[in-house]
Swiss-Prot record:
Family: Belongs to the universal ribosomal protein uL29 family.
Tree of life domain: Eukaryota
InterPro entries: Ribosomal_protein_uL29 (IPR050063), Ribosomal_uL29 (IPR001854), Ribosomal_uL29_sf (IPR036049)
GO cellular component annotations of the record: chloroplast; cytosolic large ribosomal subunit
GO biological process: translation
Protein name as catalogued: Large ribosomal subunit protein uL29c
Disulfide pattern: none
Cell location: Plastid, Chloroplast
PANTHER family assigned: 60S RIBOSOMAL PROTEIN L35/50S RIBOSOMAL PROTEIN L29, LARGE RIBOSOMAL SUBUNIT PROTEIN UL29C
Source organism per UniProt: Guillardia theta (Cryptophyte)
Pfam families on file: Ribosomal_L29
Gene3D superfamilies, sorted: 1.10.287.310
Length: 65
């Protein structure tokens, strides 16, 4: 969903949307870590991608308040 949004679209999100998205991304990161720990096949680039998106969203949220 939000992985295809650019920064202008991310800035238009409300605080609740940002919080929901960050929570969802953190859950996905946790699931990726579990898959890695159990030696399932994963796509390593997703770790970096999700972490960067979380950082972007939290930065936008802090700028708004």
């Amino acid at each position: 969903m939000t992985t295809n949004l650019d920064s202008t679209q991310l800035e238009k999100l409300t605080d609740t949307d940002i919080n929901d998205t960050v929570l969802k991304l953190k859950k996905e990161l946790f699931e990726l870590r579990l898959q890695k720990a159990t030696r399932q096949e994963i796509k390593p680039h997703l770790f970096k991608q999700k972490k960067k998106l979380i950082a972007k969203l939290l930065t936008i949220k802090s700028k708004k308040s």
